[in-house]
């Protein structure tokens, strides 16, 4: 499957109108033809938590969202992207429930990772635990096996409860390979074009390592699942939050990767009034990436920016974002914090709010994203230039909900009337339709307070100039007659 070089939308199944049916209605009524690049529907499956990222099964769509028919209907107009949480399943899945009932005699016993699978005595030394890149304070959860009363400690990378509701799977086991094949086949049967391999960096569990992106084991798994996907006509997109060198290794092997570095670099440039660091980064990054500014989690810092930032600069950016209502996701592992104790994993907030609801700055940020080589993704809150929703974060106790507002159809229609949204829609159309973006990219020389980017393909030429002193951005492009046209962003 060939990924189209057009803008994609990221949305929850219920965030634009309430379900997949209303999502399709909103797309066709208000955004017709705008997202031919694809619609990334965040997990629409039955789930026990984490807003869909604790899947009970992939064979069904959660009834409150709709059916597979709704997914197919959306897919007839735009390629559909779905998530496959290759690292874990819900504790409420039939697979883990059978394991809790029958323990070692369960037909799914090899699917999960009890501590004894890595440490024969089942008791990992504290110094080895401290090596891990933790996403919760402890990487394990204790459960009682119903058949025997035995307490079993299983690997749970993610989860906000104790015990966790997200149970890691052993991707090298026969059961996992069989299930992943069945899940991917279900996706193919329903016309899914791209599968995002959520949290794939955490699938490698090996004693004496960080158990994150362990080489060469990670490549063996990726080769297997990419081969499976390709045979089914599906493209895979590994989701890996790691330092840039690790990401670039994936790119060198021909995988699509996420540009998790760009959001911070754009934010830093607009807040510090200099494009020097952003320009240096654009010159070194590989082009085969999905670009983003915002998503359902936050603006990545550690480990994504490791080796690319100074903590004193990052602290300034973080402090400004906090003043504008953001909250932070911390790094739990002391060994993986910055040398001076800097411990920000992600900045959580609406990108529009992080830029102080400044229309010009926000649209300049989007223009930079769209001119950066890669496939641009726009998160649904960002599409509507939405702001922080602190009440949602307070109500749920999940700081990420600050950027996960659910819009009714009436709200969508109201937000569409705002000039900033109309300007963004025009920018998306330009990015989708202008031929030069399939041509040659160039970073032009400029003073540090300006970013100057251009694309050229035959007679089609376009150039973006962003002045960080004023937050103003201007596109100059050649029309069908070759005449220059200025397009204020």
Predicted segments, located by residue:
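Acidic/aromatic-lined carbohydrate-recognition and catalytic surfaces
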Residues: 2-175, 185, 189, 200-272, ...
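Generic recognition of stable, solvent-exposed alpha-helical segments in well-folded globular domains
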Residues: 18, 66-69, 175-182, 213-224, ...
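Intrinsically disordered, low-complexity boundary segments flanking structured domains
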Residues: 28, 98, 127, 139-140, ...
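Short acidic/polar active-site loop segments enriched in Thr and Asp
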Residues: 37-39, 193, 376
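Conserved, mostly hydrophobic/aromatic
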Residues: 41, 58, 83, 180, ...
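A sequence-level detector of short linear motifs
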Residues: 153-155, 463, 486-488
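C-terminal beta-sandwich/jelly-roll accessory domains of carbohydrate-active enzymes
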Residues: 470-489
